[in-house]
Amino acid sequence: MVRTRNAILPDVEQIHAIIRAYSGNGTLLPRTLAELRENVRDFVVAEEDGKIVGCGALHLYGMHLAEIRSIAVTPSTKGLGAGRKLVEALLKEAERHKVTCVCLFTRIPDFFAHMGFSLAKRDDLPDKIYKDCVHCPAFNACDEIAMYRGEIPQHSGVRDLQIPKPLVKLTV
């Protein structure tokens, strides 16, 4: 039987292996071991018979928004409910933090629609876009579908940010 629990530092290598298996083909963004160690408290793992068979993280932007990210299960575990249990655990964590909206970006929207997520416009999630997406190599050609569950934030403050002007004019 699959169960979930909060990740701990000794889990990082197995989390890394699961994410790496999906980042090679572009399904997930790659995560370094150092990044995973720094953010291990964001992760939940799925275990079956004492072996980690899946992972997922909840990144908090504030009480108005959190993102489910890096969610994956081993190929042998697909279809056994591990993914659903991971999402449920992450949603409970968001609820514990009183987060009013949980978003995610995915290529499997049907899975998340069955869990109560709805389609979103990228413009509705500026915190995610300005903090993370702008650094992604696929930013201008992103094929992921934005989804949310809860109440889309009406105003987060990010839209009011001014782009800093360069201190010097660079010429080539």
Task: Report residues per predicted region.
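A short beta-loop-alpha structural element at the N-terminal edge
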Residues: 2-15
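Conserved acetyl-CoA-binding loop-helix of GNAT-fold acetyltransferases
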Residues: 73, 79-94, 104
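A conserved beta-strand-loop-helix scaffold within acyl/acetyltransferase catalytic domains
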Residues: 30-42, 47-48, 54-72
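Helix-loop element at the rim of GNAT/NAT acetyltransferase active sites that forms part
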Residues: 18-30
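A generic "binding-loop/recognition-motif" signal
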Residues: 11, 64, 107-108
